[in-house]
């Protein structure tokens, strides 16, 4: 939770790697943080390899996280991405990407990301609005993953154009406690490994 009213990050936020000033601008007077589209590493396989993930620890096994963001990709490039991600050795999220067909919102998942796993797209929808509300609901009822002592935590994703009516997208993501330890939720803004200074950005309100 954060309204981004300051000119530095609140302590609950952490970058996925050592901070680089080129990743973000903290506009406290506008109550938002701007994430600049930053090139992925040359050896990129998944978000596990991306340093400019802005994340915070999950507070419990039952809660809802909602993020309002405005995506401004550079029309010269294709493949710039942003979104809401639940990050761990397995991860899933709602990802906005500028493509040849326009902006597409996808629900993605990646198993064994720490071992070189690749992303899978579960569902996609074309969107025309630049501002969206992205949501993930975490839920656990105490049940365990079959054959283990791992707590079964389910994540369900949805999105909204107005912040009121949310539409589900994609599949339920199951996070096991063994991989759940240290899991975080947050956002990012990336582009393919294009080394120029005129990429797009994402403004995150909260």
Identify the meaning behind each predicted range.
Residues 1-206:
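Extracellular glycan-recognition regions
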